[in-house]
Amino acid sequence: MVVIGEKFPEVEVKTTHGVIKLPDYFTKQGKWFILFSHPADFTPVCTTEFYGMQKRVEEFRKLGVEPIGLSVDQVFSHIKWIEWIKDNLSVEIDFPVIADDRGELAEKLGMIPSGATITARAVFVVDDKGIIRAIVYYPAEVGRDWDEILRLVKALKISTEKGVALPHKWPNNELIGDKVIVPPASTIEEKKQREEAKAKGEIECYDWWFCYKKLE
């Protein structure tokens, strides 16, 4: 089982787009990726999730992020299900879906709940260096909110690029709106710097350890 901050394991996987190597397939293109598992093909909740992801896929791609699905079904099942979605819901799934029919990758990543034989609804956000930046789990009976995952990815990329933190419900936080949090001072000197920045109007603070500013 892996955790946030670790390197994504190097694996070769069979997908609806052919055999690919992770994380190299995406990182060598300078891209982040979202690996998400679903319990099974031809199931209602999973179908709504794939429909929802495809409807938002260009928003993820504008951020330099590619989705890739996974379940323990075989590749022919994925292909027929994708065809069904296209024929019946008028949406063409254009991202790869891993056929982890032996469950080896799912087991390695901790995607299979205790006592189960199919995956939970796991989400792994992996950056362009192959580092796992976020892991989210939903139970089989509850579908994911891709808008929240999109918010998570946007926030992670901003945090990485700007060295800031993002508050609850950003960019619609109840206290500071769409502003971002300046990391708390960790030394006396940094505390002085925060106070000086506040005096200059460069940042706002509730206290020296709780400062925020507009996103530049």
Curated annotation (Swiss-Prot):
Alphabetical keyword list: Antioxidant, Cytoplasm, Disulfide bond, Oxidoreductase, Peroxidase, Redox-active center
A GO molecular function held by the record: thioredoxin peroxidase activity
pH dependence: Optimum pH is 4.8.
CDD domains referenced in this protein's UniProt entry, alphabetically: PRX_1cys
Swiss-Prot/TrEMBL GO biological process terms: cell redox homeostasis; cellular response to oxygen levels; cellular response to stress; hydrogen peroxide catabolic process; response to oxidative stress
Any Pfam family hit: 1-cysPrx_C
UniProt domain Thioredoxin: residue ranges: 2-158
Induction pattern: Up-regulated by exposure to oxygen (at protein level).
Entry's localization field: Cytoplasm
Catalytic center residues: C46 (cysteine sulfenic acid (-soh) intermediate)
GO CC terms of this entry: cytosol
UniProt record similarity statement: Belongs to the peroxiredoxin family. Prx6 subfamily.
Additional detail: The active site is a conserved redox-active cysteine residue, the peroxidatic cysteine (C(P)), which makes the nucleophilic attack on the peroxide substrate. The peroxide oxidizes the C(P)-SH to cysteine sulfenic acid (C(P)-SOH), which then reacts with another cysteine residue, the resolving cysteine (C(R)), to form a disulfide bridge. The disulfide is subsequently reduced by an appropriate electron donor to complete the catalytic cycle.
Protein task: Thiol-specific peroxidase that catalyzes the reduction of hydrogen peroxide and organic hydroperoxides to water and alcohols, respectively. Plays a role in cell protection against oxidative stress by detoxifying peroxides.
Oligomer status and interactors: Homodecamer. Pentamer of dimers that assemble into a ring structure.
Full protein name: Peroxiredoxin
Organism: Pyrococcus horikoshii (strain ATCC 700860 / DSM 12428 / JCM 9974 / NBRC 100139 / OT-3)
